[in-house]
């Protein structure tokens, strides 16, 4: 696999504060990368640099061996799609109209099958004629996810598999739809799309990601396969809380929901 996306000592500073400090990553085509870390660790800032929305103060970000900021807006939009954590829509568009926006200026006739497939994928086919403001927050998030799937599909027809960036995509979703969304992202990765997602649920990250990137205070704390990253010592240090990391029968790590009592620590580490 070729290096699809690369950050080289990428740093972002504003107002004298360094939000992301000298982060280097090499991401292959078709990988699913989960970015995790506590609040204020620099996750969204890093994602925006990788997307081309923010230009690094120092260092570089390259998409397919080319500086990401050198792409013209339309060309960049055809190669990467980003689902932001909060999307504000001022007008009462229908779900169908929102999803169609992912096709840009392409004709409806040329993109209708992509729109239909995306609505079906997110479970909103029966909601396509509903006004977006009448939907719940989670349903609106799913509509915007369908929009970026259409954007990816249109770009793939021109350039091949692209880049999907997700900023806390599950924050407003119930458990079932959290699993559905991340499963869809994983399926995109298996089909060649490079996926980078900020996730707060470490169990989701461990279950679906090929690699987990951990940020702490703007710096890279860890980068590797889930079973190497989701370890008691790292989780305790980065998140400043004691949680019990266990291994499932298939070798995937998972974190128990309850905090570990201090007198259980010796047994846990044994």
From Swiss-Prot:
Cited PROSITE patterns: ABC_TRANSPORTER_2, HMUV
Cited InterPro entries: AAA+_ATPase (IPR003593), ABC_transporter-like_ATP-bd (IPR003439), P-loop_NTPase (IPR027417)
Signal peptide: none
SUPFAM superfamilies recorded: P-loop containing nucleoside triphosphate hydrolases
EC number: 7.6.2.-
Residues annotated as domain ABC transporter: 5-242
Binding site for ATP: 37-44
Enzyme class label: translocase
Alphabetical keyword list: ATP-binding, Cell inner membrane, Cell membrane, Membrane, Nucleotide-binding, Translocase, Transport
GO cellular component terms, A-Z: plasma membrane
A GO term, aspect molecular function: ATP hydrolysis activity
Localization (cell): Cell inner membrane
Topology with respect to the bilayer: Peripheral membrane protein
Biological role stated in the UniProt entry: Part of the ABC transporter complex HmuTUV involved in hemin import. Responsible for energy coupling to the transport system.
Entry similarity comment: Belongs to the ABC transporter superfamily. Heme (hemin) importer (TC 3.A.1.14.5) family.
Family annotation (NCBIfam families): PRK13548.1
Assembly, per entry: The complex is composed of two ATP-binding proteins (HmuV), two transmembrane proteins (HmuU) and a solute-binding protein (HmuT).
Protein name according to UniProt: Hemin import ATP-binding protein HmuV
The organism's taxonomic lineage, starting at the top: Bacteria, Pseudomonadati, Pseudomonadota, Alphaproteobacteria, Hyphomicrobiales
